[in-house]
Protein backbone atom coordinates (compact mmCIF):
# COMPACT_ATOMS: atom_id res chain seq x y z
CA UNK A 1 0.00 0.00 0.00
CA UNK A 2 1.30 3.46 -0.89
CA UNK A 3 1.96 5.81 2.02
CA UNK A 4 -0.53 8.58 2.69
CA UNK A 5 0.31 11.68 0.65
CA UNK A 6 -0.61 15.33 0.22
CA UNK A 7 -4.09 15.62 -1.29
CA UNK A 8 -5.30 12.31 0.14
CA UNK A 9 -8.30 12.09 2.42
CA UNK A 10 -7.23 10.79 5.82
CA UNK A 11 -8.67 7.29 6.25
CA UNK A 12 -10.98 6.60 9.15
CA UNK A 13 -10.04 4.07 11.78
CA UNK A 14 -10.24 3.37 15.49
CA UNK A 15 -7.69 4.41 18.11
CA UNK A 16 -7.79 3.97 21.89
CA UNK A 17 -6.97 6.13 24.90
CA UNK A 18 -7.82 6.64 28.56
CA UNK A 19 -10.03 9.64 29.30
CA UNK A 20 -9.78 11.99 32.31
CA UNK A 21 -11.93 9.59 34.36
CA UNK A 22 -9.43 6.82 33.57
CA UNK A 23 -11.94 4.99 31.37
CA UNK A 24 -10.71 3.22 28.26
CA UNK A 25 -12.22 4.82 25.16
CA UNK A 26 -12.19 3.96 21.49
CA UNK A 27 -12.51 6.84 19.06
CA UNK A 28 -12.79 7.18 15.31
CA UNK A 29 -10.09 9.26 13.69
CA UNK A 30 -12.66 11.11 11.59
CA UNK A 31 -14.51 12.21 14.74
CA UNK A 32 -11.29 13.85 15.95
CA UNK A 33 -10.31 15.42 12.64
CA UNK A 34 -13.43 16.32 10.60
CA UNK A 35 -13.89 20.07 10.28
CA UNK A 36 -10.62 20.85 12.07
CA UNK A 37 -7.00 21.67 11.34
CA UNK A 38 -5.07 18.86 13.02
CA UNK A 39 -1.53 17.60 13.34
CA UNK A 40 -1.34 13.82 13.45
CA UNK A 41 2.13 12.56 14.21
CA UNK A 42 3.30 9.02 14.63
CA UNK A 43 6.28 7.46 16.33
CA UNK A 44 7.84 3.98 16.23
CA UNK A 45 7.38 3.42 19.95
CA UNK A 46 6.53 4.93 23.30
CA UNK A 47 9.50 5.44 25.61
CA UNK A 48 12.02 4.94 22.79
CA UNK A 49 14.88 7.47 22.82
CA UNK A 50 14.23 9.65 19.76
CA UNK A 51 10.47 9.60 20.28
CA UNK A 52 10.71 10.46 23.98
CA UNK A 53 13.58 12.93 23.95
CA UNK A 54 13.02 14.78 20.66
CA UNK A 55 9.83 14.12 18.70
CA UNK A 56 7.15 14.36 21.41
CA UNK A 57 8.84 17.15 23.43
CA UNK A 58 9.05 19.25 20.27
CA UNK A 59 5.28 19.11 19.78
CA UNK A 60 4.66 19.82 23.47
CA UNK A 61 7.01 22.83 23.40
CA UNK A 62 5.59 24.21 20.14
CA UNK A 63 1.91 23.53 20.93
CA UNK A 64 1.13 27.17 21.67
CA UNK A 65 2.72 28.33 18.44
CA UNK A 66 0.92 25.61 16.47
CA UNK A 67 -2.41 26.54 18.04
CA UNK A 68 -1.80 30.23 17.25
CA UNK A 69 -1.62 29.20 13.57
CA UNK A 70 -5.05 27.57 13.67
CA UNK A 71 -4.23 24.00 14.73
CA UNK A 72 -7.05 22.71 16.93
CA UNK A 73 -5.75 19.23 17.79
CA UNK A 74 -2.29 17.67 18.12
CA UNK A 75 -2.53 13.89 18.09
CA UNK A 76 0.31 11.43 18.72
CA UNK A 77 -0.19 7.81 17.67
CA UNK A 78 2.00 4.80 18.25
CA UNK A 79 1.71 1.05 17.81
CA UNK A 80 1.46 0.46 21.54
CA UNK A 81 -1.42 -0.50 23.79
CA UNK A 82 -3.46 2.20 25.55
CA UNK A 83 -1.92 1.38 28.95
CA UNK A 84 1.56 2.12 27.61
CA UNK A 85 0.35 5.31 25.92
CA UNK A 86 -1.29 6.45 29.16
CA UNK A 87 1.94 5.90 31.11
CA UNK A 88 3.96 7.65 28.40
CA UNK A 89 1.62 10.66 28.42
CA UNK A 90 2.01 10.91 32.21
CA UNK A 91 5.79 11.15 31.75
CA UNK A 92 5.19 14.65 30.30
CA UNK A 93 3.54 16.56 33.18
CA UNK A 94 4.02 19.84 31.28
CA UNK A 95 1.85 18.60 28.39
CA UNK A 96 -1.47 20.37 27.99
CA UNK A 97 -2.24 19.91 24.28
CA UNK A 98 -0.87 16.67 22.80
CA UNK A 99 -3.28 13.70 22.92
CA UNK A 100 -1.69 10.24 23.05
CA UNK A 101 -3.61 7.58 21.10
CA UNK A 102 -2.91 3.85 20.84
CA UNK A 103 -2.94 1.85 17.61
CA UNK A 104 -2.34 -1.44 19.40
CA UNK A 105 -2.59 -3.76 16.41
CA UNK A 106 -1.11 -1.34 13.84
CA UNK A 107 -4.43 -1.40 11.98
CA UNK A 108 -4.57 2.36 11.52
CA UNK A 109 -0.86 2.57 10.77
CA UNK A 110 -1.47 0.02 7.99
CA UNK A 111 -4.39 2.12 6.65
CA UNK A 112 -1.94 5.04 6.40
CA UNK A 113 0.60 2.85 4.60
CA UNK A 114 3.22 3.71 7.21
CA UNK A 115 4.21 0.37 8.73
CA UNK A 116 7.81 -0.14 9.76
CA UNK A 117 9.08 -3.70 10.20
CA UNK A 118 11.29 -3.77 13.29
CA UNK A 119 11.09 -7.53 13.91
CA UNK A 120 14.85 -7.93 13.71
CA UNK A 121 15.10 -5.52 16.67
CA UNK A 122 12.45 -7.41 18.61
CA UNK A 123 9.82 -4.69 18.20
CA UNK A 124 7.54 -6.26 15.57
CA UNK A 125 5.49 -4.03 13.30
CA UNK A 126 5.63 -0.37 14.24
CA UNK A 127 4.89 2.98 12.63
CA UNK A 128 7.31 5.00 10.59
CA UNK A 129 7.97 8.36 12.16
CA UNK A 130 5.75 10.97 10.49
CA UNK A 131 3.85 14.21 10.90
CA UNK A 132 0.73 15.04 8.90
CA UNK A 133 -1.01 18.38 8.67
CA UNK A 134 -4.68 17.65 8.02
CA UNK A 135 -7.39 20.22 7.32
CA UNK A 136 -10.96 18.86 7.41
CA UNK A 137 -9.74 15.32 6.59
CA UNK A 138 -7.55 16.42 3.66
CA UNK A 139 -3.77 15.95 3.99
CA UNK A 140 -2.04 19.30 3.43
CA UNK A 141 1.49 18.18 4.42
CA UNK A 142 2.94 14.68 4.77
CA UNK A 143 6.37 14.65 6.40
CA UNK A 144 7.30 10.97 6.43
CA UNK A 145 10.64 9.62 7.60
CA UNK A 146 12.57 6.77 6.04
CA UNK A 147 13.38 3.99 8.49
CA UNK A 148 13.93 5.28 12.00
CA UNK A 149 15.23 8.69 10.93
CA UNK A 150 14.21 12.03 12.46
CA UNK A 151 14.88 14.64 9.79
CA UNK A 152 11.54 15.92 8.39
CA UNK A 153 8.76 15.23 10.92
CA UNK A 154 9.46 17.60 13.81
CA UNK A 155 7.14 20.30 15.13
CA UNK A 156 9.45 22.87 13.53
CA UNK A 157 9.04 21.13 10.16
CA UNK A 158 5.24 21.23 10.46
CA UNK A 159 5.36 24.90 11.49
CA UNK A 160 6.95 25.64 8.11
CA UNK A 161 3.91 24.05 6.44
CA UNK A 162 1.39 26.25 8.25
UniProtKB/Swiss-Prot annotation:
InterPro entries: PRX5-like, Redoxin, Thioredoxin-like_sf, Thioredoxin_domain. It comes from Populus trichocarpa. The active site is a conserved redox-active cysteine residue, the peroxidatic cysteine (C(P)), which makes the nucleophilic attack on the peroxide substrate. The peroxide oxidizes the C(P)-SH to cysteine sulfenic acid (C(P)-SOH), which then reacts with another cysteine residue, the resolving cysteine (C(R)), to form a disulfide bridge. The disulfide is subsequently reduced by an appropriate electron donor to complete the catalytic cycle. In this 1-Cys peroxiredoxin, no C(R) is present and C(P) instead forms a disulfide with a cysteine from another protein or with a small thiol molecule. This is Peroxiredoxin-2. Residues 4-162 form the Thioredoxin domain. Keywords: Antioxidant, Oxidoreductase, Peroxidase, Redox-active center. The active site is at 51 (cysteine sulfenic acid (-soh) intermediate). The lineage of its organism: Eukaryota, Viridiplantae, Streptophyta, Embryophyta, Tracheophyta. SUPFAM superfamilies: Thioredoxin-like. It catalyses: [glutaredoxin]-dithiol + a hydroperoxide = [glutaredoxin]-disulfide + an alcohol + H2O.
